[in-house]
Every structure is written in C-alpha cells, then in structure tokens.
C-alpha cells in the first residue's frame, strides 16, 4: 500500500511513465487516423514527455511541489504538436494543484488529475470529445470517485487505468472518423501508456527500455561532430572502423561478452550489435587491420568501412576558418515562419520573414524552439506563422510565455503561410497585421499531394498503402496508384470558374515528367487560370497547391 507520494516517488512515476510511452510511441503513431506519412501523436507525446523527464532527472527533489514545477516546466518547453501541448497542459494543471505540498495522498492525487483536465480543456479553443481530453476527463472523474473509498494510491491508479482504458475503447463511438478507420484515439492511448508507467513506479517496478530491432542491412552510422574543440594531434584513435561479420559454421563460436572484451582492447567508442547470424561493430582504433583480422575468426567479413578522423577533423577546421557562423538577426519586429524545404524557406525570406524555423510534418518544433528564436532575436514584437495545424498550439504556447508582444497567425499550411505573409505590413501594429493576415488565410484554398503509409478508408475514399493521395486542407479527395491521375483529380476539386491564380510548389520527390504533364493539363483545362510554379524542395509532399 502507498498512502503518500513524495517528490522521489513522483520522479520515478514520471520516469517510468516516460519510458512506457517511449516504448509504445510507434504503436501510438500507428493509430493516427490519416494515412499521411507524418511523425505525429506518438512521436510528439514521446518527445514532450522525454523533455519533462530530463528536466526532472536533472533537478530531483523530495518535495513533490518543487518537483512538479520542474516537471511542468520541462513539458511546457518541450511540447511538440497538439498532442504534446495538451499533455503538457494536463500536467501543468496537475502540478499547479500540488505546488504547495511536500507530499500528497490519494485524495489530492485524484484532485490533481481533475485540475489537469480543467487546465487542458481551457487551453484548447474547440475541445473535441473522443480524444485524449475525453480519456483524461473520464479517468479523472473515476479517480475522484475512487478516492472516497481508498487511501491506497496503487489501488487508485489501478482504477484510473481500468476506466481510462474503457474510455479509450469508447472513443470510436464519440468520433466518427475513428470508427470509420477502425482505431481508438492515438492521444488517449499515449496518455494511458503514461498512466501505466505511473502504476509500475507505485508498485516499485521498472519499465524496461525497449531495444529497437536493427535491420541487418543497416550498418552502424556514426557522426563525428568535432566543432574544432580539440586539436588534431589530440585524437588518440584516428580511424573510425566499422565491420559486419557473418558467422561461419567452422569458425570460432561467438560469445558476445568475450567479443566485447577483446574488441575493447583495440580502441574506444565501441558498439557491438549481435543479430544471431551477423555481428556489427563500430570502434575508433589506431589499427583497423587488427580489428578486421580479429573479426575473421568468427566468419566472413561482408561490410567494411574505415574513415580517417584526423583528416576529417582537419577538414572541419579548414571549413570553420572560412565560414563563420551567422549571428541570429536582431530586429524590432520578428516575423517567424515554420518552413520545410530550402526553396520554401527562400520564398519566405524573399517575402520579409526575418527568422525561419525548420520543421513541418515529420518534426514539429517544440515550444522551446520557438521561444529561443524570439528571445535571441531580441525583438519587441513577434509574428509567428506555424504553417501546420500540428504546430499551432506550440506556437500559441510560445507566444504566451515570451516577454515580447507576440501574435500567432493561424496558418495551417505552407500556402496559407505564403498568402498571410504577403499581407504583412511592417509599419502596421501587431493587431492590424493579425487581422489582415488572418483574413487572407480564409481567401486561399490549400491542397497537397503525398503518399499513403497504410491501407484504410476515410472520408469515403478507399486508400491503398503507397498510393498517392490528394488532399484539400485536411480532407482526402483522391487516391490513385498513378500520380498524374491523382493530381488532376485533386485540381479538378480545387479549381472553379472564378479561380484566378494557381500556385504550385514542387517538392523534392516530384518527377519532372509529371510536373510537365500537369502544367500542360492545367493550361488546356483551365486556360484562364494564371499558374505560378516554385521549387519548394519540401520532403514527403510532391506538391503543394494554393488557389485564389
């Protein structure tokens, strides 16, 4: 029985909760409703929770109130994506409720879960039921009820998990799109993983780190990040050496402990990955030949690589001497845009953006990433264009905590961001800019072409894995195996008689032949529409479109 939770135990709950979420991040990602290739809910919740965990591990306290402040700060600054921001708000309210306590009992634990729910609902402009919010709410209500009957925090947490799981299983009945696709809510699943980790800690158990399975065809990849902090002659082991050995029947029997011990004599930075049939080795050594000779005792050498790190270091020094790092530009009004692709970044810069944050579908910048840019710019005012619906909440959170006066333009796509930035007037007030830039977002129709990562049926469209998908805003309107067919079906949905301008932003994976045929088709079918084509270089999306 656990009747009290202090800072030490709460820290372990956080650590185990974060680990369990990390172990299940891929599973949570797989529950994403839309088959768009993004690193969405699981990835973002994991990165957010990991940020909170790291802050806690670096600032341990027996006082649960003090530890809660630390945890909340870590989550707040590390929050990525809407799911990560909501997670940070759930625990922001939780931790606010315990900030004056040195330890808490089951009743206060339940009340804190409820306080977190109230904070999170306030943070979301239009709360949707059948999501992480619903699971958190139902779990908190169950906790309040159970706390009247038990003083045991373990028993309380067990009941919370039962009710959270019931709520999760019910999410398809509350959100039609979940039922159509046949999944439960991904954010709710992520939260349940955290709660399950909490219970493990309360029981004195540990969540073992999940070891990622490494593809046999993937060799050890090593980056040597010198940054000129050492002298070339100080490098003791000069050769980054890698080998892959396929075990042989008539060769020496492989014993990993013995192998590691022997290999460690050759150098440092040793990494050994044993995959039953193959062993993969990475080591920094002065004698690569000895490493290879040793490996041959066990079987056939099938992949070898040697890099001279001293020469790499000299090259880094030469480059750093010729290329000074640019200083962060300081401005009165910072215009900050989230961008994906060098071409798109150049478009934003040419239109007046002062600061570009690299991000987008597969890696949403955190609240802290945005805060740092604002602070380093030393601006008095900031205009933030997230250009992705999943970066909107992190942008708003960043705007709310910086000292500068900051506004967020609710751009949910790159085309919307370009349209909004076109309306920006540096001589106008923030509120004037916010009004006219936000208004421009409503006047542009955004579309995109990408590929599906799994089979599904959504919005009445049958989708096969690896097929192309045409989207208008977030709605899938076309999916075919042929790229040009998908594009033309998408554009037929986007273009109308009164359409005047079509902007095409070409991604890094677009095929020139498809682009040429698409432009010819547009000119034939919509001769009155002016077409503007830009090289965007964005990943994942072959094309972005905007119609005005």
Curated annotation (Swiss-Prot):
Superkingdom assignment: Bacteria
GO biological process terms held by the UniProt record: glycerol metabolic process
InterPro entries: DegV_domain_contain, DhaL_dom, DhaL_dom_sf, FakA-like_C, FakA-like_M, YloV-like
Coiled coil: none
Domain DhaL: 8-200
Pfam families assigned to the protein according to its UniProt record, in alphabetical order: Dak2 (PF02734), FakA-like_C (PF13684), FakA-like_M (PF21645)
Listed GO MF terms: glycerone kinase activity
PANTHER family reported for this sequence: DEGV DOMAIN-CONTAINING PROTEIN DR_1986-RELATED, PHOSPHATASE PROTEIN
Full protein name: Uncharacterized protein MW1109
């Amino acid at each position: 029985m656990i009747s009290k939770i202090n800072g030490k135990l709460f820290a372990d709950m956080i650590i185990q909760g974060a680990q369990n979420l990390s172990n299940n991040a891929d599973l949570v990602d797989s529950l994403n409703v839309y088959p768009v290739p993004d690193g969405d809910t699981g990835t973002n919740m994991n990165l957010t929770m990991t940020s909170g965990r790291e802050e806690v591990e670096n600032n341990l306290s027996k006082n649960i109130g003090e530890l809660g402040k630390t945890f909340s700060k870590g989550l707040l600054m590390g929050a990525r994506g809407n799911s990560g921001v909501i997670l940070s708000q759930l625990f922001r309210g939780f931790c606010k409720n315990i900030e004056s306590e040195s330890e808490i009992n089951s009743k206060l634990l339940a009340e804190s879960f409820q306080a977190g729910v109230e904070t999170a609902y306030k943070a979301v402009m239009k709360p949707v039921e059948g999501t992480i919010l619903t699971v958190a709410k139902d779990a908190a209500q169950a906790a309040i009820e159970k706390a009247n009957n038990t003083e045991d925090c373990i028993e309380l947490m067990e009941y919370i998990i039962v009710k959270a799981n019931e709520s999760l299983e019910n999410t398809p009945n509350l959100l039609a799109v979940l039922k159509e696709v046949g999944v439960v809510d991904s954010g709710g699943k992520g939260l349940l993983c955290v709660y399950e980790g909490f219970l493990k800690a309360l029981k004195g158990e540990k969540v073992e780190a999940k070891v990622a399975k490494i593809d046999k065809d993937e060799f050890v990849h090593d980056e040597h990040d010198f940054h000129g902090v050492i002298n070339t002659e100080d490098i003791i082991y000069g050769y980054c050496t890698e080998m892959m050995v396929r075990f042989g029947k008539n060769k020496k029997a492989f014993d990993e402990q013995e192998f590691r011990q022997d290999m460690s004599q050759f150098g440092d930075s040793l990494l050994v990955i044993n995959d039953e049939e193959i062993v993969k080795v990475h080591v920094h050594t002065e004698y690569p030949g000895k490493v290879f000779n040793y490996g041959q005792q066990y079987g056939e050498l099938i992949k070898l690589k040697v890099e001279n790190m001293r020469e790499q270091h000299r090259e880094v020094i030469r480059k750093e001497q010729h290329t000074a790092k640019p200083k962060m530009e300081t401005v009165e009004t910072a215009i900050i845009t989230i961008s994906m692709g060098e071409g798109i970044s150049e478009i934003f810069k040419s239109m007046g953006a002062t600061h570009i944050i690299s991000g987008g579908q597969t890696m949403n910048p955190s609240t802290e990433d945005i805060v740092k840019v604002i602070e380093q710019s030393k601006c008095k005012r900031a205009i933030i264009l997230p250009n992705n619906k999943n970066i909107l909440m992190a942008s708003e959170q960043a705007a709310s905590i910086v000292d500068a006066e900051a506004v967020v333009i609710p751009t949910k796509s790159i085309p919307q961001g370009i349209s909004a930035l076109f309306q920006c007037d540096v001589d106008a007030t923030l509120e004037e800019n916010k009004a006219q830039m936000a208004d421009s977002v409503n006047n542009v129709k955004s579309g995109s072409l990408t590929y599906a990562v799994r089979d599904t049926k959504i919005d009445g469209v049958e989708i096969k894995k690896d097929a192309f998908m045409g989207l208008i805003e977030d709605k899938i309107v076309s999916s075919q195996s042929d790229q040009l067919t998908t594009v033309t079906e998408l554009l037929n949905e986007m273009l109308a008689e009164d359409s005047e301008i079509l902007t095409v932003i070409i991604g890094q994976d677009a095929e020139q032949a498809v682009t040429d045929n698409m432009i010819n088709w547009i000119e034939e079918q919509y001769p009155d529409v002016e077409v503007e084509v830009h090289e965007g270089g964005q990943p994942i999306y072959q094309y972005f479109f905007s119609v005005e």
